[in-house]
């Protein structure tokens, strides 16, 4: 299991907001964010290619688009704070960038939870060369 963690760290990097995003995913889905989502479909984890395979993969596509809109905010490395109120994720508001990054992650974590019933194990470790089609625009 330790080797899997080391590989996952190399693949997705555990820095900045990725730590908070991982916690959100774990809290919302009760799934391990690294083993369940880092290589899922065509849009989760590093790189984005082709059409989303299903609703969960679409969550990742939308999340990537959200981050793209915030590229000046360094969304993968800029850490933020959040808390929960009555089970709901509430993003802190220390700066505009941190709040917006948190909101992107919040929306994706909720999207994953809302699509748990259609999570497809065959896409859990999906090889990107299988991803075909013209990618949608954000």
From Swiss-Prot:
GO MF annotations, alphabetized: acetylcholine receptor inhibitor activity; calcium ion binding; calcium-dependent phospholipase A2 activity; phospholipid binding; toxin activity
One GO term of the biological process aspect: arachidonate secretion
CC per GO annotation: extracellular region
Cellular compartments annotated: Secreted
Tissue: Expressed by the venom gland.
InterPro entries per record: PLipase_A2, PLipase_A2_Asp_AS, PLipase_A2_dom, PLipase_A2_dom_sf, PLipase_A2_His_AS
Keyword Ligase: no
Transport in keyword set: no
Gene3D superfamilies, A to Z: Phospholipase A2 domain
Pfam family, one: Phospholip_A2_1
Ranges that cross the membrane: none
Disulfide cross-links: 42-131, 44-60, 59-111, 65-138, 66-104, 73-97, 91-102
SUPFAM superfamilies reported for this sequence: Phospholipase A2, PLA2
Position of the signal peptide: 1-16
Keywords attached to this entry: Acetylcholine receptor inhibiting toxin, Disulfide bond, Neurotoxin, Postsynaptic neurotoxin, Secreted, Signal, Toxin
Domain of life: Eukaryota
Important for membrane-damaging activities in eukaryotes and bacteria, as annotated region: 121-133
Alphabetical list of CDD domains matching this protein: PLA2c
Stated family: Belongs to the phospholipase A2 family. Group II subfamily. S49 sub-subfamily.
Role played: Snake venom phospholipase A2 homolog that lacks enzymatic activity. Is able to suppress the acetylcholine (ACh)-evoked current mediated by alpha-7 (CHRNA7)-similar nAChRs in L.stagnalis neurons (IC(50)=2.18 uM). This activity is only partially reversible and seems to be non-competitive.
PANTHER family per record: PHOSPHOLIPASE A2 FAMILY MEMBER, PHOSPHOLIPASE A2, MEMBRANE ASSOCIATED
Protein name listed in UniProt: Basic phospholipase A2 homolog Vur-S49
